[in-house]
Amino acid sequence: MSTVANPNYKKGFVPFAIAALLVSLIGGFTAVLGPAFVADQGIDYNNTTWISLALAMSSAACAPILGKLGDVLGRRTTLLLGIVIFAAGNVLTAVATSLIFMLAARFIVGIGTAAISPIVMAYIVTEYPQEETGKAFGLYMLISSGAVVVGPTCGGLIMNAAGWRVMMWVCVALCVVVFLICTFSIKKTAFEKKSMAGFDKPGAALVVVFFSLFLCIPSFGQNIGWSSTAFIAAAAVALVALFILVMVEKKAKSPIMNGKFMARKEFVLPVLILFLTQGLMMANMTNVIVFVRYTQPDNVIISSFAISIMYIGMSLGSVIIGPVADKKEPKTVLTFSLVLTAIGCALMYLFKADSSVAIFAASLGILGFGLGGNATIFMKVALSGLSSEVAGSGTGTYGLFRDISAPFGVAVFVPMFANGVTANIAKYASGGMEEGAATVKAAISSIQTLTLVELGCIVVGIILVRMLPRIYQKKEA
């Protein structure tokens, strides 16, 4: 991999790190937004899935596009543009008055996120010496996960004291501060802007269409019906979009999706495992919040503290487990971290109506610790060998699959839990059980079923990890 000789690369990384801090901190603040909004609007809790997916669709699908744009316009311009869009989305979130309005606002927030994250990773790939990129990605993961440690707790406290709209205006103020910092601290360079004439616009449009539908399809199936017209139509459009996307990208001179980069084993295998396991974090975070809403409706803070513990675990996993893979075989380290992930999920089976913050925190904390280690290792492996010319599109492509794995988990596991609760409430109520008792029993039964399904996914993930090639030894040979 070629790197740029920059003696001030660590100092130059500071504003990019602050931008990453902004995204993760506000992500933590808004972890409690979905359930609060649907409760405020008086609509079903399963609508939290759509709020999460709206942001996830744009942040994932637009990542390779805006990463590619960074290769064309330059990092500084793209980063500042991303912060502006990110701030605008949060302003719209603060004034949202309906579900449709909120979905549009979160979609815009996701576009801003998609412009910021690939640029930060591209800086690491191109400016840091090759022998220090592992530590740099560990630092990036620490910033990304560590910042949201205080986010859910602070967000919950602000929301409890003043409401979710005030919480969002605090987020907007943070965006303004970070924009000013980045504007004055990132120096204009001699970067030569490339012409937009050869920009892969058809590929960009098809990427958004396919991957947005890819995220929505599981929710369509579970909420509307697997044999419904909407599900069949969405699946058909997605397949057609995928076929056309492959054809377009094969012919494009400068494709959004770099086929050579994606075809490597170092990319394919980690992505498959990410889809099986990494989505558990966001899904379980949402499900714990909803579980507490069902079983302890007057307790706003308990789930926020538990989520903060999860991000502490993720931060520790990224800096403790992740770097171990530089010395030991990655698949051995990954197996260990996935076992920890399984333990975290298994603890959900013990959730009860009167469970304390301790068991919620233990479950999410251990889960975060295991997944934090995985994420760091996968990032170092998948992004190896990128040249500076395609750093933006490469990191954006990886970011697409990394980011889409989490909301894909949300699209599968959150409706599975929420719809399970709804079905069980109806079943227990029809048997003569009082509504409150039926709701609590339904939530416990559904979380236990969900636990068994998630453990099955982790087992498959471990099997795939054991099939990984001896990655680092192979590179040394």
From Swiss-Prot:
Localization, UniProt: Cell membrane
This protein's pathway: Lipid metabolism; bile acid degradation
Signal peptide residues on this chain, from the entry's feature table: none
UniProt entry keywords in alphabetical sequence: Bile acid catabolism, Cell membrane, Lipid degradation, Lipid metabolism, Membrane, Steroid metabolism, Transmembrane, Transmembrane helix, Transport
GO biological process: bile acid and bile salt transport; bile acid catabolic process; lipid catabolic process
SUPFAM superfamilies linked: MFS general substrate transporter
GO CC terms in record: membrane; plasma membrane
InterPro entries: MFS (IPR011701), MFS_dom (IPR020846), MFS_trans_sf (IPR036259)
PANTHER family according to UniProt: MAJOR FACILITATOR SUPERFAMILY MULTIDRUG TRANSPORTER MFSC (PTHR42718:SF9)
Name of this chain's protein: Bile acid transporter
The species this protein was found in: Clostridium scindens (strain JCM 10418 / VPI 12708)
